[in-house]
UniProtKB/Swiss-Prot annotation:
Family: Belongs to the peptidase S1 family.
Active site: 44, 93, 191
Top enzyme class: hydrolase
Record protein name field: Fibrinolytic enzyme, isozyme C
Record organism: Lumbricus rubellus (Humus earthworm)
Entry keyword set: Disulfide bond, Fibrinolytic toxin, Hemostasis impairing toxin, Hydrolase, Protease, Serine protease, Toxin
Disulfide pattern: 29-45, 127-197, 158-176, 187-219
């Protein structure tokens, strides 16, 4: 998260750190706990990765302190059958992680509440993005979970804001947030994690998908951050989680 602040411990109890093994384990993406055995993430976070090289940590606040957390390996995952790999705009960028061991719910570990239906576009609602993604133009990731409050914009506003960005297609199954001041947004490492919106309690209404970055890889928060719209996939999530 660019321009964010430290979250409080347990503030987003469904937030997971999705980690990849390559020599050692390290944070690669976010995810949201759906149940004790399933998690919601982005297809681009798992595309081409062997399941036994993926794990999630629940109840985590600080990457350097795993006390009170639970770790579960991933035994398989389901990517969306129409995931648009290779396109700049990652269509249907959603996936379910199937956990090899159950996570016990309670305290700072809770399942996410999803939207009830696809009736609310959340435009104009100030929501909260969260993640352990980059906080600046370097590859350095924060130790403490970051958050930032940003308003949701309409699909039309998001499309207009992306004019001139090569390959940036915005569809109705996207949901975008944009900081009017251009100071805060998602970045690499936030992918797969939640867009948290107030709606009779907090609901996870988006999965972090992509952002605009410079040729040097610096995320540009003056452009919208683009999320997969969870409410467009409620049936798919129900069919593929356990």
């Amino acid at each position: 998260v660019i321009g964010g602040t430290n979250a409080s411990p347990g503030e987003f109890p469904w937030q997971l750190s999705q980690q990849r093994q390559s020599g050692s384990w390290s944070h690669s993406c976010g995810a949201s706990l759906l149940s004790s055995t399933s998690a919601l993430s982005a297809s681009h976070c798992v595309d081409g990765v062997l399941p036994n090289n993926i794990r999630v940590i629940a109840g985590l606040w600080q990457q350097s302190d795993t006390s009170g957390t639970q770790t579960a390996n991933v035994d398989s995952y389901t990517m969306h059958e129409n995931y648009g790999a290779g396109t700049a705009s990652y269509s249907n960028d959603i996936a379910i992680l199937h956990l090899a061991t159950s996570i016990s719910l309670g305290g700072n570990i809770q399942a996410a509440v999803l939207p009830a239906n696809n009736n609310n576009d959340y435009a104009g609602t100030t929501c909260v993005i969260s993640g352990w993604g980059r906080t600046d133009g370097t590859n350095n990731l924060p130790d403490i979970l970051q958050k930032s409050s940003i308003p949701v914009i309409t699909t039309a506003q998001c499309t207009a804001a992306m004019v001139g960005v090569g390959g940036a297609n915005i569809w109705d199954n996207h949901i975008c947030v944009q900081d009017p001041a251009g100071n805060t947004g998602a970045c690499n490492g936030d992918s797969g994690g939640p867009l948290n919106c107030p709606d009779g309690g907090t609901r996870v209404v988006g999965v972090t998908s992509w952002v605009v970055s410079s040729g040097l890889g610096t995320c540009l928060p003056d452009y919208p951050s683009v999320y997969t719209r969870v409410s467009a996939y409620l049936g798919w999530i129900g069919d593929n989680s356990r």
